């Protein structure tokens, strides 16, 4: 059977191409990976995103924090190796790995005049693995994009299970928000001499994301 099957056109992007696209996207927009409140980040910039402190009674100005992610890397089905349980990479899925560094501004006591003490950064770095799948958004021939939707997130080497559940949930929300900005436009998937009218896909097989359709 031909690659196009019952369709007139087939296009794909392989695992290396996806990772190159992620490198290019986040390399040009590092503020999608670096978030912090004052004093860690003082204003929005091309490299960082300012967020509000966490309000809490009795903590003047709120709890300061920062979250930094490394550029995610993908592994398209079939997997290059086994994932940590309970994660299993199935057909039409991809895994993403990143390192998340969470920093809290810890107030070290009070000064002699009773004012708030100095804020000291306390950080931890976590290895994060997620499983997701591609979805498409189509507007017109050749115009649209593929994005990623998460199915499950695991923070490795965390105990007890209750803390694992909290961190898994936290990182799933953060990664989902970050990935909602990532779009792989059709023009990096299809070829220059035709504009794809999307009819099927995206699917994942043979380490590539595949879409099918007609041509314009």
Stretches with model-predicted labels:
Residues 1-113, 142-216:
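Tubular lipid-binding modules of the TULIP superfamily
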Residues 85, 128-139:
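Extended lipid/amphipathic-ligand handling interfaces
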Residues 114-131:
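Amphipathic hydrophobic-ligand
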């Amino acid at each position: 059977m031909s690659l196009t099957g019952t369709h007139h056109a087939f296009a794909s992007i392989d695992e290396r191409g996806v990772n190159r696209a992620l490198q290019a996207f986040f390399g040009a927009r590092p503020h999608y990976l670096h978030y912090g409140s004052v004093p860690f980040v003082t204003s929005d910039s091309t490299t960082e995103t300012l967020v509000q402190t966490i309000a809490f009674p009795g903590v003047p100005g709120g709890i300061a924090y920062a979250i930094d992610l490394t550029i995610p890397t993908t592994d398209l089905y079939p997997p290059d190796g086994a994932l940590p349980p309970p994660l299993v990479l199935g057909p039409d899925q991809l895994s993403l790995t990143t390192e998340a560094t969470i920093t809290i501004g810890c107030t070290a006591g009070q000064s002699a005049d009773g004012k708030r003490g100095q804020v000291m950064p306390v950080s931890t770095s976590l290895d994060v693995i997620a499983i997701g799948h591609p979805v498409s958004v189509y507007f017109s021939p050749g115009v649209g994009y593929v994005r990623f939707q998460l199915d499950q997130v695991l923070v490795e080497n965390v105990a007890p299970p209750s803390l694992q559940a909290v961190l898994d949930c936290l990182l799933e929300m953060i990664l989902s928000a970050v990935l909602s900005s990532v779009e792989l436009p059709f023009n990096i998937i299809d070829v220059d001499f035709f504009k794809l009218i999307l009819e099927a896909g995206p699917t994942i097989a043979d380490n590539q994301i595949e879409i099918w359709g007609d041509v314009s």
